[in-house]
Swiss-Prot record:
Residues 1-31, 80-117 are annotated as: Disordered. The lineage of its organism: Bacteria, Bacillati, Bacillota, Bacilli, Bacillales. Residues 98-115 have a biased composition (Gly residues). It holds the Pfam family DUF444. Belongs to the UPF0229 family. This is UPF0229 protein BA_0551/GBAA_0551/BAS0519. InterPro entries: Spore_YhbH (IPR014230), UPF0229 (IPR006698). It comes from the Bacteria.
């Protein structure tokens, strides 16, 4: 074979699966991180360091380390064919210790000193963005409707086209190789080499204009003297995540913050999350303020309206009937009304007793008794609807 006919490439015959070990380990690590986020999410969402942060911090969560393959001494000295029932996963501990059937103290968890090895854990840093992705993926504004007077449009970029020219960073390797295989196969060559210019395929984006309805969320919080430090923290934790959820998933959602004791007033967001007040409780005042806002600023013909009220349920008894009437009036103009009650010790609530008589399906309530209930309240209020979504 002449020098000019010598191939300018070689094909390696080594085991390429060995080169993927680092990638496989990285994938296993990411799976463990996502599993840890999912398992710890109800507790993580109420971490004070997150709720009181600027939204850019990271948190640390414990993750079980993966056991690498190792040779262990066979204490039982028995012959074995295999292990397990087929449910084992990479990294699971499969060896037995040399107890000889005797009872052991265990790995040192709880009281007393154990004598067995424990599970290795390490702390992984997780950004709030990763928490949001895990938390918000199954949440949506319920009963979102198209409004007749709505003319909003959202520009959305979608990679939905394949072209023969484009940026090298957007080259579609799979389609390029398939194209080369087809061309070479027609010439009797069972390979994708060489790749010609005509084989190149590039992913290309198009700008898509999607109609989008306006929505407004009325965040109403009881700041009276009966709302202690823990109650206010729970309410603010809910509204913290609600605000981030709305601003992450929806581009045209307004949020109005209303604080109340015996009187209600619209306050800036920073004051809503930081300022404490005292005094008695007349919840009807905040519903009147909400109706006033709707009448003056947010017409139901143009806006999807979602009021959310958080309180400890300790309302002036004579005001409860008025509250029920105003809530029913609000629901005629709103897509959904959400009431969250922070009631750690399961005490009698005059307000909840009145609200339980409301039978409207668009009225949702949730009683929060522990920190993890902030997560469950979000899932309850913003759960995905089984019916048709807004077109």
């Amino acid at each position: 074979m002449g020098e000019e006919n010598q191939p300018n490439y070689t094909i390696s015959q080594e085991n390429w699966s060995l080169h993927r070990k680092g990638y496989d380990d990285q994938q296993r690590h990411q799976e463990k991180v996502q599993e840890a986020i999912k398992n710890n999410l109800p507790d993580l969402v109420t971490e004070e360091s997150i709720v009181m942060s600027n939204g850019k911090d990271v948190v640390k969560i414990p993750i079980r380390s993966l056991d690498e393959y190792k040779i262990r001494y066979n204490y039982d000295k028995n012959k074995h064919v295999g292990q397990g029932n087929g449910d084992s996963k990479v990294g699971d501990v499969v060896a037995r210790d040399g107890s000889g059937g005797q009872k052991q103290k265990g790995p040192g968890k709880g009281q007393g000193a154990g004598d067995a090895a424990g599970e290795d854990y390490y702390e992984a840093e997780v950004s709030i963005l990763e928490l949001e992705q895990a938390f918000f993926k199954e949440l949506e504004l319920p009963n979102l409707k198209r409004k007749e007077m709505d003319e909003n449009r959202i520009e959305h970029v979608e990679f939905n086209d394949i072209r023969k020219t484009g940026l090298w960073g957007n080259i579609d390797k799979k389609r390029t190789m398939i194209s080369a295989y087809k061309r070479n196969a027609m010439r009797g060559k069972a390979s994708f080499h060489p790749i010609h210019q005509e084989d190149l395929k590039f992913r290309t984006w198009n700008e898509v204009l999607k109609p989008d309805s306006k929505a407004v969320v009325l965040a109403m919080m009881d700041t009276s003297g009966s709302m202690g430090i823990w109650e206010k923290y729970m309410a603010r934790s809910f509204f913290f995540w609600m605000t981030r959820f709305l601003r992450t998933k929806y581009e045209t959602v307004d949020i109005e913050f209303i604080a109340h004791h015996t009187e209600a007033k619209v306050v800036p967001e920073e004051e809503f999350f930081s300022k404490g007040e005292s005094g008695g409780t007349i919840c009807s005042s905040v519903y009147k303020k909400a109706l006033e806002l709707i009448d003056n600023k947010y017409s139901p013909d143009r806006y999807n309206i979602y009021p959310f009220h958080f309180s400890d349920g300790d309302n002036l008894t004579s005001d409860n009937a008025r509250c029920v009437k105003l809530v029913e009036e609000l629901m005629k103009k709103c897509n959904m009304f959400g009431y969250g009650e922070v009631n750690q010790y399961n005490r009698h609530s005059t307000l909840m007793s009145a609200y339980k008589n409301i039978k409207d399906e668009n009225f949702r309530y949730y009683i929060l008794k522990q920190k993890a209930d902030v997560f469950h309240a979000m899932k309850s209020f913003f759960r995905e609807e089984s019916g048709e979504k807004m077109a």
